[in-house]
């Protein structure tokens, strides 16, 4: 059995995990292949898990703090890499020793150089491939020139890698992997054009973490248009409760939801989707062929996504919400000609087969035989012993609770 490890993250937005799932769906179609999606932050223990949990609150309430972090680390990645290498070494090596993979794929930037350092330090010959999860603005921590391959979902991301001095021979242009649930829905159902003869179905999203001006946008749409609005709040339960209370006067014209696993249904139904410029959600919507209005983006890795969407005609952009109503009226003029033009451009852009094509490429790089993992010494043996003791105590306590 050939084993593939995908290094992802469960708490830094949902995009990385969605990409990992899209790859796993395709890779497991191959005979004698198993795929394990691993949260890379777990290799750093509880500290790593807690650190990854900060992403949601920061992107929700502290975008400028996130921008400051980007600006500092983009100039010097070495301190971050050294810290990650230090905290991940023992658990990563333990995982390799216990369950060695025939291929490692990373869809998260934080771990690439640290993991490759560890593989090199122990002379472990496991192919390591990075799949970029961003479209235009690529943080240098994504790019380690020693990787066997770096998969670039756009021309812009490939150019960014080249600007870091990466050898073109290890770069490969690919599409953006989208989960099968979206591609199959789009294959089977043609998105209906809107002609103004019924209520406008609007979908509001703000990423898996539920950040953004959802209340303001919902009010603008419901006050100014014959519209029904569905709001997806993601994991932000506080926002969901607040919107349910403050928008209740609109009755059945408003539907407020939390984190959804059936986003494709809402996208296929929507006449227009309004969202942040998150690459994963944006391209899932493009796959479903729902016209987009992008109202902003996270500083750093999403900064150029509005320009990217405009360049390829995938969306209208509105960074100032005072312009949202005029923009919407323009898109709805002449039997919604503006919305239908976006649909046309999206059809020309989208690809249903990117994930399967990437999987085919990855399968060609899987080792035929299990790699040799040498014996190693823990760099922090006392810490690992303490962790093991804590696990045993936790397990024992849990069993006692179940008995009672």
Where are the language model's segments positioned?
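Donor-nucleotide binding loops and adjacent catalytic segments primarily
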Residues: 196-269
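Acidic donor-binding loop of glycosyltransferase active sites
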Residues: 268-277
